Amino acid sequence: MQNELNPILLSQNSIRFATRVAIFFIIRDELVEAVTWRHPVKSMCLGLTITLLYLHPVSFSAILLLVFLTMMPISMTHDVTTNLKDLQNFMASYSSSYDQLLYFRQNYYHHITPSAISSGLLVSLVLIFLLAYLRISIDRYLPIAIWIGLISLHPKLRSYLIQFYSAKRDHVPYLQIRNELAQVWRHVDISGSQTTTRYTSFPKFNPENSVTSLDLVEPPENYSWAPQSDWTFVPPNEFRRFILWSPQPPKMNRKSSHGSNLPL
């Protein structure tokens, strides 16, 4: 219903409209919940709605045209009075729609729970509406990209991808050695009373025998692994372990009365 321009009514509608702009923030919060999969039903409905809007935008054009003509009727004149009247009626229609939406949310929204039955029912209704208008062409890959992006934002997949990326970024040399069985080399550095064995896939000086696993690495001659020591990964591509000096006692020989050498 289109009312004639009235200053008092225009002022009242302006106040009503100013107190009901929270709907835009509510929509923003709902979109955040849908994109981040906090509410799976909203996420599925968002993906289906975007798919339908892309494949068949004409399906929404009739609804948008009806709303536009109802709120903002076409005027043959461009005077200030007509514009103010349209603005007055638009604010009144918006305020009434907001009040009805708020009434539905307060009285009926609690029945739509994220349980299995209600979730399946709501998704099925949207899916049926989508399939009724869906005609996929081979050259339209944007919906597939939209769904891949939406699914990748799921908490489980998102945490898996972040964990995989972090492990790949922080432990690439370690994973490369363990998985590809790359030949690695052992080096010995002597510093003071302790000796450190470095285990790396990039030899920097004369290498010893190559091995394919840390389990096959033996301490240098006359050395043993330090007690309670283990291999430690040192970025970017080294493994280190402490060793201690433990020489084998030399074998001493003695001469018998007949001149032969007898081991002690």
From Swiss-Prot:
The chain crosses the membrane at residues 48-68, 112-132, 142-162. GO terms for biological process: peroxisome organization. It comes from the Eukaryota. It is a multi-pass membrane protein. One of its GO terms (cellular component) is peroxisomal membrane. It is found in: Membrane. InterPro entries: Peroxisomal_Membrane_PEX28-32. The modification Phosphoserine is found at residue 260. Keywords: Membrane, Phosphoprotein, Transmembrane, Transmembrane helix. Disulfide bonds: none annotated. Coiled coil: none annotated. This is Uncharacterized protein C737.05. The lineage of its organism: Eukaryota, Fungi, Dikarya, Ascomycota, Taphrinomycotina.
